[in-house]
Amino acid sequence: MINPSGLLTCLLIATGLLVGTHQNSEAKPKPKKLVKVWESDTTLRVPESVLFDHTTDIIYVANIEGKSDELDGSGFISQMSLDGKITNLRWATGLNAPKGMGLYRGKLYVTDVYRLVEINTATGQVEKTYDAIDQKNAFLNDVTVAKDGTVYVSDSRFDKIYRLKDGKWEVLISGEQLNKPNGVLADGKESILVGSTKTGALRRLDLATLKMTTIADGMAATDGIVTDGKSGYFVSDWNGQVFFVDKNGVKESLLDTRTGKINSADIEYVKSRKLILVPTFFKNTVVAYHVE
């Protein structure tokens, strides 16, 4: 004889399992996909970094034009529109090998081998420069600016992170624990994210303790780091990959152009358009992908 209460219990358990399974399947986010939208012309010259100004809809492009550490004065900054047109190829000139960029209140901060330069966005003229402590042993690479205007700069060859705060330019942290830092991203008031090229890791630097913790690894030559505007990050590998890293440190491959020998240097994300902008370095273009 079937026990009615036992049957009811079994049905409830089964229903609960089905509901739980359904909820778990819904909770798992769909994989992201990149769809190419446009590619600029090839008049750029070794574009290393791109930066979007949401107040003007201008895309800035740092062009090395030459070797990445050569002091030849041939580097320049271009301006582009959101549809991929180069509106001013040589907007700011006279740089050496410009790379990472950051914006704050009408000032564009750009690394230039051994120095950080401050450019007035209204004129395109360099107004201030900040030299590395040892100009012959410096390779300043990426820039990030916190909401309060504090500027952080990585030195990827000589394991340093500089800070420019209230006009004071200093080394914030140095040493092999940085593992050749490249990409940097201000992440709130208490920390910055650092891409350690030597280990292919995305790491968090606590600004109070200067201790580092690893968020995700296995991304080869980590270059650009940008937020998705929520709780995740897009990270580029200079060799030609782009990853998405969620808040739990789980990474997802979005782009791999290594077989075509197309690099992906210091990327940008335009949240309003869901566009990832990828400078292709030796291919002399910027490519825009829609995140779907």
Question: Where does each model-flagged region fall?
Answer:
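Short loop/turn segments that connect beta-strands within beta-propeller blades
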Residues: 80-84, 120-125, 164-168, 206-210, ...
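Bacterial N-terminal signal peptides
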Residues: 9-18
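Beta-propeller domains
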Residues: 62-83
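WD40 beta-propeller blade core
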Residues: 78, 117-118, 162, 203, ...
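Short glycine/acidic-enriched loop and turn motifs that connect beta-strands
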Residues: 65-69, 115, 158-159, 199-200, ...
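Beta-rich, blade/repeat-based domains predominating
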Residues: 43-56, 73-74, 92-108, 134-151, ...
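Asp-box/WD-like beta-propeller blade repeats and closely related beta-sheet repeat scaffolds
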Residues: 34, 115-148, 154
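A short beta-strand motif characteristic of beta-propeller blades
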Residues: 35-41, 85-92, 125-133, 168-175, ...
